[in-house]
Amino acid sequence: MKNESTTIDVPAESSSAMKGKAPLIGVARDHTTSGSGGYNRGLSIFDFLLRLAAIVAALAAAATMGTSDETLPFFTQFLQFEASYDDLPTFQFFVIAMALVGGYLVLSLPISVVTILRPLATAPRLLLLVLDTAVLALNTAAASSAAAISYLAHSGNQNTNWLPICQQFGDFCQKSSGAVVSAFISVVFFTILVVISGVALKRH
């Protein structure tokens, strides 16, 4: 008697079916990556717009303080009454510092554009975070010191016999105070920029 053998064919999963399953994982991964990239790109666009606004605020502060000179319409034979920002070292520092802040913001625009084109890149965002933090400190120092001098110009100090001058030099005080306000607006913009960079890096 011949031995009869039975062969059972187990259908193997075709290679085409295996290939059909593989992209599913890739698609899900790409979807997650694209979602994160889209969120970061939105932050980068907002970052760019904030930098434009901060440029206007910083340069306006420097220009306003730099053009705040005022000469009183009356004078004597030997004296001419004039108030100028360069009479006070603090206001001189303010003009220089805010000009530097505005210049940095202009130079940072190309880096901000890179973060828009490459929203998942870490290096440009980290560079902006470090530089923004340093320039924020400079901006805050300039605005705070100028605010103290502006307060003295408005109110004076009886303990040191510093008399207020804003009753005589109204235009000078008005322009210098406006420059200080503009500088603090720039501080707010910088603070938001630092927060944006931190959030974008955290999502990486």
UniProtKB/Swiss-Prot annotation:
Record topological domains on the Cytoplasmic side: 1-42, 114-125, 200-204
Keyword tags: Cell membrane, Cell wall biogenesis/degradation, Membrane, Transmembrane, Transmembrane helix
Extracellular side: 64-92, 147-178
Main subcellular location: membrane
InterPro entries in the cross-refs: CASP/CASPL, CASP_dom, CASPL
Short name of any one Pfam family annotated for the protein: CASP_dom
GO terms under cellular component: Casparian strip; plasma membrane
Keyword Transmembrane helix among UniProt keywords: yes
Membrane topology classification: Multi-pass membrane protein
Subcellular location field: Cell membrane
Keyword Repeat: no
GO terms (BP aspect): cell wall modification; cell-cell junction assembly
Ranges that cross the membrane: 43-63, 93-113, 126-146, 179-199
NCBIfam families: A_tha_TIGR01569
Function: Regulates membrane-cell wall junctions and localized cell wall deposition. Required for establishment of the Casparian strip membrane domain (CSD) and the subsequent formation of Casparian strips, a cell wall modification of the root endodermis that determines an apoplastic barrier between the intraorganismal apoplasm and the extraorganismal apoplasm and prevents lateral diffusion.
Family per similarity comment: Belongs to the Casparian strip membrane proteins (CASP) family.
Quaternary structure and partners: Homodimer and heterodimers.
Protein name as it appears in the record: Casparian strip membrane protein 2
Organism: Arabidopsis lyrata subsp. lyrata (Lyre-leaved rock-cress)
